Amino acid sequence: MKIAVLLTCFNRCQKTLKALDSLYKAAEVFNEKNSMKLNLEVFLTDDGCTDNTSSNVKKAFPDKNITIVEADGNAFWAGGMRLAWNKALEYHNRIDFYLLINDDAQFLQTAFDEMFKTHNYALATYKKGGVYTGFIADEKDTNKIIYGAKYHKKAFLSKTYNMMPKNMPQECMFTNANFLVVDKHVVDEIGQLSIGYKHRDADWDYGIRALKAGFPVLTTYGVCGVSVNDHDSYKQEAEKGSQDESQGPQTISEQAPARIS
């Protein structure tokens, strides 16, 4: 099973090394207990790093399949991710999934279990693969979810609310790309990240586009990794709304918005 791992980096070498190390270890754990074997191929955009990110990554993982895409420091997050994805698309025929990650996350050894449990749920429930966003917890308090998915309860332009794990996949609207899985058939239909975004929100837009194209957009069952919490936790933000509003949408059809790209 070939997974193209996409990330973009700017002067966060040590975090990038930890992120990749944790991801490789998660794949090893998955492969040890499953007959289906994962083959990760990393496409990393070096957006003008001055901390030797690329060379250190190559040195740390000499036996891994890693492609470095050079940028000039002006790609920013969305631009850097598009560059990495464009390179991966050259090998689209041999890729089964695209996995978008953030370089400041560290992934749990169960991350790929979460991915494939969610994928199997999508196949059983919707008869097709889709887009799956993994919950990321605060590394200092794993009860606090800091990235994952958001939704609108009512009108499209109303306030968004954060979602919490419920030990089962949940339909969602806005996706964070800290651990974002995209089935290749989604890419066949809608392509990659929109060129209309330079830095943030391109991952939100992608979930909406997939949803509008008729693909399931789901959270994972549980947490896939941890990261530094430099935002309000999902739980704290959700508490600013009503308890009812924090429950999330019941069906995709209730939440289908107009395309914003």
Where do the model's predicted regions map?
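Active-site-adjacent helix/loop segment of glycosyltransferases
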Residues: I208, K212, P216-S261
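Short, well-formed alpha-helical segments that are part of the catalytic scaffolds
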Residues: R12-K33
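A conserved acidic beta->alpha catalytic loop
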Residues: T45-S55, G73
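A short, conserved alpha-helix in the catalytic core of glycosyltransferases
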Residues: F174, L180-V182, V186-G191, G196-V223
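Short beta-strand-to-loop element that shapes/binds the nucleotide-sugar donor at the catalytic cleft/hinge
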Residues: G130-I146
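Short beta-strand-to-loop acidic/aromatic patch adjacent to the donor-nucleotide binding site
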Residues: R94-Q106
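Glycine-rich, basic loop-to-helix element that forms the pyrophosphate-binding segment
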Residues: A71-E90
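A recurrent flexible, glycine/aromatic-enriched loop bordering the glycosyltransferase active site
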Residues: Y161-V182, P249-T251
